[in-house]
């Protein structure tokens, strides 16, 4: 069996600190082992073949509806996180398949319009129920556990990708600001080093590509980059990326935690503050945020009043496992209706959300 040969190879080649595929804590619903893929390789494939993964190409990273083909979107961000985390994992002799699975799945629950969309959706959810929230890390886990459909080898469709514990935990803990999730420990860091690699790689990726895109958009110039960042990390973006990756590798070798040096940490914080001031808050993308709030708020309120308008979506949503008449059921259960509408809107691409608002407001456009 090819899988068993590969598992033996992992045991021989990977670090004692790596997470071996054969030692996975397994899946919520036990499955037969695949003859040629390890559990983590199988998870990579399940995520890449999912609809949620394909939709990432039409979701904003920072620049909403950018004029140009070379700006990052949520899919290219995901691929860059995967590339960085894989480089670090291989150098540290960690499990590259586990790293890759977490990386490709980490943003599956992201809303349209980037973090502006996430904030708008969170505010809208809280408007209806103050104790509810929308956070993309939790939604990413909800996507892989519940919302995404897959076809089993017997031809039957089921809800949820049924990923391994380690991949699910890595997805849930890839970002700061996470509420405790009942399935995982309350420690903010993933328990696997591979999960920690992805968490740090996510940060490295967005610092690198958000600056690159901001320079391309002429929002900032290379000369504007703070001196501390240049002195510590390098005088161009390519050099800075290499410095960060090498620093993670050097500082984390043979350690039970993935880390960076104090000097580099300070430089990264300075870089983030610079982007926040010049790009995230004080520039063109920020001006677009008001439009995002209007779009998300309009759609949310519209579907709270007209839940029957998404009847087709409801019949492909796991709510159908609870009731044969989801429209009537949700009209009686407002809390669940809020969650389902958040599921629906967060699954949208930027362009679909914009076109939807236009079609609702102007059903018969003047020709």
Predicted regions span which residues?
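Histidine-centered, transition-metal-coordinating active-site segments
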Residues: 1-78, 82-88, 95-96, 117, ...
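Active-site alpha-helix of zinc metalloproteases
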Residues: 101-102
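Short active-site segment of divalent metal-dependent hydrolases/proteases
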Residues: 105-113, 205
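A generic membrane alpha-helix/interface feature
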Residues: 111, 124-125, 220, 367
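A glycine- and small-aliphatic-rich helix-loop capping segment at beta-alpha/alpha-beta transitions
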Residues: 114-127
């Amino acid at each position: 069996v090819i899988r068993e040969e590969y598992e033996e190879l992992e045991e021989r080649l990977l670090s004692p600190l790596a997470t071996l595929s054969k030692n996975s804590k397994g899946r919520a619903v036990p499955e037969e082992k695949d003859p040629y893929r390890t559990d983590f390789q199988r998870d990579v494939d399940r995520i890449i073949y999912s609809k949620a993964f394909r939709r990432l190409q039409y979701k904003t990273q920072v620049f909403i509806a950018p004029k140009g083909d070379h700006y990052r979107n949520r899919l290219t961000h995901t691929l860059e996180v995967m590339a960085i985390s894989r480089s670090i994992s291989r150098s540290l002799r960690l499990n590259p398949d586990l790293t890759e699975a977490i990386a490709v799945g980490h943003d599956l629950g992201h809303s349209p319009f980037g973090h502006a969309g996430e904030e708008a959706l969170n505010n809208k959810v809280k408007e209806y129920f103050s104790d509810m929230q929308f956070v993309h890390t939790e939604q990413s886990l909800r996507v892989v556990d519940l919302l995404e459909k897959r076809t089993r080898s017997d031809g039957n469709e089921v809800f949820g990708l049924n990923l391994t514990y380690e991949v699910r935990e890595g997805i849930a803990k890839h970002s700061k600001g996470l509420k405790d999730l009942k399935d995982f420990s309350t420690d903010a860091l993933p328990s696997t080093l591979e999960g920690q690699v992805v968490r740090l790689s996510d940060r490295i990726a967005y610092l690198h590509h958000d600056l690159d895109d901001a320079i391309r958009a002429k929002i900032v110039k290379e000369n504007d980059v703070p001196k501390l960042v240049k002195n510590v990390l390098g005088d161009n973006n390519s050099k800075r990326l290499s410095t960060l990756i090498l620093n993670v590798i050097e500082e984390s070798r043979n350690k039970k935690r993935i880390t960076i040096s104090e000097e580099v940490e300070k430089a990264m914080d300075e870089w983030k503050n610079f982007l926040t001031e010049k790009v995230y808050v004080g520039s063109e993308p920020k001006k677009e945020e008001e439009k995002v709030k209007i779009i998300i708020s309009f759609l949310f309120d519209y579907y709270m009043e007209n839940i029957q308008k998404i009847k087709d979506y409801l019949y492909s949503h796991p709510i159908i496992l609870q009731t044969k008449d989801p429209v009537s059921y949700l009209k009686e259960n407002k809390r669940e209706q809020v969650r389902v509408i958040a599921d629906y809107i967060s699954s949208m691409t930027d362009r679909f959300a914009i076109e939807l608002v236009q079609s609702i407001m102007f059903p018969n456009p003047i020709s």
